[in-house]
Amino acid sequence: MCIRHRSFDGHTAAVDALASGAAAVVTQDRLGLENELRVADSRSAYARLCAALCNHPERKLRMIGVTGTNGKTTVTTLIRNILSDSGTKTLLTGTVCNRLGDENLPSGLTTPKPPELYSLLSRAVSQGCKACVMEASSQALAQGRLEGIDFDAAVFTNITRDHLDYHGTFENYVSAKKKLFEHSALSIVNLDDPRANEIIAASKGKIITFSTVLDCADYTAKNISLLSDCVRFELVSKGHIEHIEFASPGLFSVSNAMAAAVCAVNLGIEPKDAAQSLAKSKSVCGRLERVECSAPYSVIIDYAHTPDGLEQVLRALRPSCRGKLIVLFGCGGDRDKTKRPLMGAAACKYADKIIVTSDNPRSEDPIKIIGDILKGTDKKRRDLFVEPDRRKAIVLALKTAEPGDTVLLAGKGHEKYQLIGGEKLPLDERETVRKILGLPHDTGRKKQ
């Protein structure tokens, strides 16, 4: 397969491939080779070929895709839980892990590449799965990894700036997201998002909307209670009222729970069954995850790595914070640089103490990344600290925290490593916190 990548054009290897024994090459460009099979889009052809070689397992499953800047992991997990609790064995693919029934499998990419994806789907079919819930990333959609899949349902959570290092412009980013809804029988759309109408316009199937504020939506949330450890609300549609509780704070948790419930109900699940499943669902690993410790302050780990994501998490934690709200965060290297000062500004607006550190600097100088973040902050603040070493930054956060404070470790979430230079170094923030506090090793997180 001759695929044009950002740093390498596979067409340049076509002659060598034939010389090495390949029977033919599939190309997007005319190369003038004898055994050349030309296609309009080699990425699309690659995905479709992988599907065919695995005997099209995607046609034997109810395919549900979830896309958006924030909330994908939580929403897919909740949908998977609802379907599983209703007796439908379900494959979950996403950022944190791939889960086949009750078996956790490692996850490399948010959305697997075609060979891995169809191998996983084929395995799911052979083991009796009837549905697949997957996170559909913008890169996967732009690269055509999901070409040829007719989704039974597609869910839109929200869209804010992210991945501009890959897409170039925000409009390109939005356009990539819209692709999911062009091939879905059902579109579940968050009407609270400013770009919702664009998603609706791109949708080819039935459209169902939900909102936390707009009565014109098909499903609305009423009598919302934002508590320190959960949200409660009434899911209202055509006169039917279902009481929902989900163990995660913040208004965005209402939106996530709504997205999952609305999707499940429109796939045939009874509203009361969806509500019961949500009520017993735990927070997802690395998403507003509370570290169990004996400290007189709270320690929260969250994957927030965008300006909007960081703002939403800080706002969610504020009501339950009796003391100072302390945030520790950095920004990824070799990624969208324009969001760095915006992350700094969000932290300054909503946190009482800020510790700027490293995330995954990759090939960039961590000090340069931190400098970009600081451009969005008030450098005169006495409660703004810089510590490039993330472990040392966590020590600083915990050693200076006082009773009643809330410490948010943002950006890493479920990740248990740091990418520094060309190395992947171990860093489990849960264990780091426990070690600093002199606590024993955690034997494992409870099942979600």
For each feature predicted by the language model, list its residue ranges.
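Adenine nucleotide phosphate-binding catalytic loops in nucleotide-utilizing enzymes
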Residues: 167-174, 201-311
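Phosphate-binding loop of NTP-binding sites
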Residues: 46-191, 195-206, 258, 267, ...
